[in-house]
C-alpha cells in the first residue's frame, strides 16, 4: 500500500471519529479531557472483560453441567 493512501485513510478515520462523537465542536482542552475519559473507559472495559468474563463463563459451565447431570471434575478424575 502507498504511504499517502494510509495517511489519507487514517485522517478519514479521525474525521469520522470527530463527526460521530461530535467532539469537533469542543475546544482543544475540552477535546483532550474528552479523549482521556473515553480512552480510560475503554481501557477499563477491556481490562474488566479480560479479568471477569473467563471466571463467569467457568462458573456458568459448572452450574449448567450440574443441572444437566454432568459429572463434577473430581469425579471424572477418580474414574480415570
UniProtKB/Swiss-Prot annotation:
Q: Which family does it belong to?
A: Belongs to the SPTSS family. SPTSSB subfamily.
Record's InterPro entries?
Ser_palmitoyltrfase_ssu-like
Q: What name does UniProt use for this protein? A: Serine palmitoyltransferase small subunit B
UniProt pathway: Lipid metabolism; sphingolipid metabolism
Membrane topology type: Multi-pass membrane protein
Give GO terms for biological process: ceramide biosynthetic process; endoplasmic reticulum organization; sphingolipid biosynthetic process
Q: What is the annotated role of this protein in its UniProt record?
A: Component of the serine palmitoyltransferase multisubunit enzyme (SPT) that catalyzes the initial and rate-limiting step in sphingolipid biosynthesis by condensing L-serine and activated acyl-CoA (most commonly palmitoyl-CoA) to form long-chain bases. The SPT complex is composed of SPTLC1, SPTLC2 or SPTLC3 and SPTSSA or SPTSSB. Within this complex, the heterodimer consisting of SPTLC1 and SPTLC2/SPTLC3 forms the catalytic core. Within the SPT complex, SPTSSB stimulates the catalytic activity and plays a role in substrate specificity.
Provide the alphabetized UniProt keywords: Endoplasmic reticulum, Lipid metabolism, Membrane, Sphingolipid metabolism, Transmembrane, Transmembrane helix
Amino acid at each position: 500500500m502507498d504511504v499517502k493512501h494510509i495517511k489519507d485513510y487514517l485522517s478519514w478515520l479521525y474525521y469520522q471519529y470527530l463527526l460521530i462523537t461530535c467532539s469537533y465542536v469542543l475546544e482543544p482542552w475540552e477535546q483532550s479531557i474528552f479523549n482521556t475519559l473515553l480512552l480510560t473507559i475503554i481501557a477499563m472495559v477491556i481490562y474488566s472483560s479480560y479479568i471477569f468474563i473467563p471466571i463467569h463463563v467457568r462458573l456458568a459451565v459448572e452450574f449448567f453441567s450440574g443441572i444437566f447431570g454432568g459429572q463434577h471434575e473430581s469425579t471424572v478424575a477418580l474414574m480415570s
